[in-house]
C-alpha cells in the first residue's frame, strides 16, 4: 500500500510555504496517528507544504519507521530546472542530469558542478554551445535558480494553485 499525504491549507498569492507551517503542522499532528493506525505497513509519500517540515512532523508523530516515509523534497524544483535547461539548449529533459538540493522552494540551491548534459559537464557543454552559436548568451546561474525558486509562486498568482506539476512529480516518485 502507498499513502500520499497532501493535507493542509494551500498557498495564497504572495504567501511563502513557511507561512503555512503552523496550521499545516497542527493538521499533520491530528491526522498522522490516525492514518498510521489504519495503514501501519504502507509506504508514505508526504507532499504537504512546507514539505520538509511536514515530513519531519509525520515521522515524529506517526510512529511509522523512517524507512517507510518519503518527502517529495525538491523533485518539483528539479523538474523545473530540467525544463528550463531543456528549452535553453533545445534538448530532451531525459538527457539533462541536474538536480536541485536543499529545502523545496526559496532556500533551495543548484550544485552546478554536478550538472551534466548527456554525460558532459554542463560547463563544458555551455562552452561548446556558446562557441557554436554566436548569438547564444551564457547561462546565468542566478537567474535560473530564481526561476526554479519562484515558479510555484508565479503559478499560484496566475492560477490560484499548483495542481498538475505536483501530481506529475508524485507520479515520478511512485
Residue ranges and their predicted role:
Residues 3-4:
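N-terminal Rossmann-like NAD(P) cofactor-binding module of classical short-chain dehydrogenase/reductase
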Residues 7-9:
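Conserved NAD(P)H cofactor-binding loop of Rossmann-fold oxidoreductase domains
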Residues 11-13:
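N-terminal glycine-rich phosphate/adenylate-binding segment common to multiple enzyme folds
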Residues 16-82:
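Rossmann-like NAD(P)(H) cofactor-binding subdomain of soluble oxidoreductases
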Residues 62-68, 77-174:
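C-terminal substrate-binding/catalytic lobe of Rossmann-fold NAD(P)-dependent dehydrogenases
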Amino acid at each position: 500500500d502507498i499513502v500520499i499525504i497532501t493535507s493542509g491549507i494551500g498557498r495564497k498569492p504572495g504567501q511563502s510555504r513557511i507561512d503555512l507551517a503552523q496550521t499545516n503542522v497542527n493538521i499533520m499532528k491530528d491526522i498522522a496517528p490516525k492514518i498510521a493506525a489504519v495503514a501501519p505497513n504502507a509506504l508514505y509519500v508526504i507532499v504537504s507544504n512546507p514539505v520538509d517540515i511536514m515530513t519531519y512532523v509525520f515521522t515524529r508523530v506517526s510512529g511509522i519507521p523512517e524507512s517507510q516515509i518519503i518527502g517529495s523534497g525538491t523533485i518539483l524544483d528539479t523538474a523545473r530546472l530540467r525544463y528550463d535547461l531543456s528549452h535553453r539548449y533545445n534538448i530532451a529533459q531525459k538527457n539533462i542530469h541536474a538536480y536541485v538540493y536543499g529545502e523545496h522552494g526559496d532556500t533551495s540551491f543548484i550544485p552546478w558542478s554536478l550538472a551534466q548534459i548527456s554525460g558532459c559537464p554542463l560547463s563544458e557543454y555551455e562552452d561548446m554551445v556558446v562557441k557554436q552559436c554566436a548569438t547564444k548568451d551564457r547561462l546565468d546561474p542566478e537567474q535560473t535558480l530564481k526561476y526554479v525558486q519562484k515558479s510555484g509562486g508565479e503559478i499560484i498568482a496566475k492560477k490560484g494553485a499548483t495542481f498538475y506539476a505536483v501530481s506529475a512529480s508524485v507520479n515520478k516518485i511512485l
